[in-house]
Amino acid sequence: MFPRPLTPLAAPKSAETLGRTPRRAPLGRARAGLGGPPLLLPSMLMFAVIVASSGLLLMIERGILSEMKPLPLHPPSHKGAAWSGTDPKPRGLSLDAGDSDLQVREDIRNRTLRAVCGQPGMPRDPWDLPVGQRRTLLRHILVSDRYRFLYCYVPKVACSNWKRVLKVLAGILNNVDVRLKMDHRSDLVFLADLRPEEIRYRLQHYFKFLFVRDPLERLLSAYRNKFGEIREYQQRYGAEIVRRYRAGAGPSPAGDDVTFPEFLRYLVDEDPEHMNEHWMPVYHLCQPCAVHYDFVGSYERLEADANQVLEWVRAPPHVRFPARQAWYRPASPESLHYHLCNVPRALLQDVLPKYILDFSLFAYPLPNVTKEACHQ
């Protein structure tokens, strides 16, 4: 059997338009006006915070927040029928007796999705989105027509390896060797490449999935990678961040020594809808209200979840998701905890609302940075 589909409840649309708060223009380009419906998400943020808080209270009651390490977002792997275009849409999985905490998280995620996505004015499909949001979404959904699935890629959540897998399934690559340099655009098909009627057909009939990660852990991973290793990001973003937020910075900083708090201050001033994809919230990248995903995998169970997806879509047995290399040192809950304990509390409180939908919709606990927790 498949996991329970993440399908929002239907609700009547509202003609009411909601206002937007002006934001600082993103680095490196001017802000342009967007056509289409009014942008609704910023006005829904307070509602999302309330919903997230109610979900977190339930998690506290069950004792889930006492552990720093996030639990998987869905039941452990189960054998079942693989996906094909004629199969019925996935339905729920039964849980074993020891999976009560897991059930709580899944229930919170589905309840929050229904509550947030069921609000009047929230999008029901990609054509309910403003033009700019729809463009971002369609540019992040990869298509496999041979295996009839759609994958919304999220940077810093193993998307490079998923792109390798898609190229192997399409016959472009012979294997998923992670030592090969990855071209992130060529030989890949995105929903944005298709006509509207082709997009609608695939959204209705294909298996749809994405993978998520603790939002702050994802930010730390992006910070370490982009500002610690990639000169282009240091020059394009790092230099301006230093000029903005570091007292006494010269007129031409190198941008190769951005601190994590400086990066977070930059995020506070950015409009989430126009962020770089490596730190744009998953909600804006994949629009889980506008696209009804059949499965949400987690970075914490990456290899097992990914191989389960490959089984569902009937990928050849020799195609397996690449194992993490022994030399790779990802941002971990422990390293995140260390960095967050050195971030001013007020700054963290300003950053969290930008990602509150990612925390609440995907059942990730908010960070514990109390004095007691930080001195353990």
From Swiss-Prot:
Keyword entries, A-Z: Carbohydrate metabolism, Glycoprotein, Golgi apparatus, Membrane, Signal-anchor, Transferase, Transmembrane, Transmembrane helix
Reaction equation(s) it catalyzes: dermatan + n 3'-phosphoadenylyl sulfate = dermatan 4'-sulfate + n adenosine 3',5'-bisphosphate + n H(+)
Residues carrying sugar: 110, 368
GO molecular function, one term: dermatan 4-sulfotransferase activity
Membrane-spanning segments: 40-60
Side Cytoplasmic, residues: 1-39
Localisation per UniProt entry: Golgi apparatus membrane
Binding site for 3'-phosphoadenylyl sulfate: 155-161, 213-221
Skewed-composition ranges (Low complexity): 18-30
Example of a GO biological process term: carbohydrate biosynthetic process
Bilayer topology: Single-pass type II membrane protein
Gene Ontology CC: Golgi membrane
Signal peptide extent: none
E.C. designation(s): 2.8.2.35
Lumenal side: 61-376
Enzyme class, spelled out: transferase
Entries under InterPro entries matching the protein: Carb_sulfotrans_8-10, Sulfotransferase
Family: Belongs to the sulfotransferase 2 family.
Protein role: Catalyzes the transfer of sulfate to position 4 of the N-acetylgalactosamine (GalNAc) residue of dermatan sulfate. Plays a pivotal role in the formation of 4-0-sulfated IdoA blocks in dermatan sulfate. Transfers sulfate more efficiently to GalNAc residues in -IdoUA-GalNAc-IdoUA- than in -GlcUA-GalNAc-GlcUA-sequences. Has preference for partially desulfated dermatan sulfate.
Protein name (Swiss-Prot/TrEMBL): Carbohydrate sulfotransferase 14
Gene name, Swiss-Prot/TrEMBL: Chst14
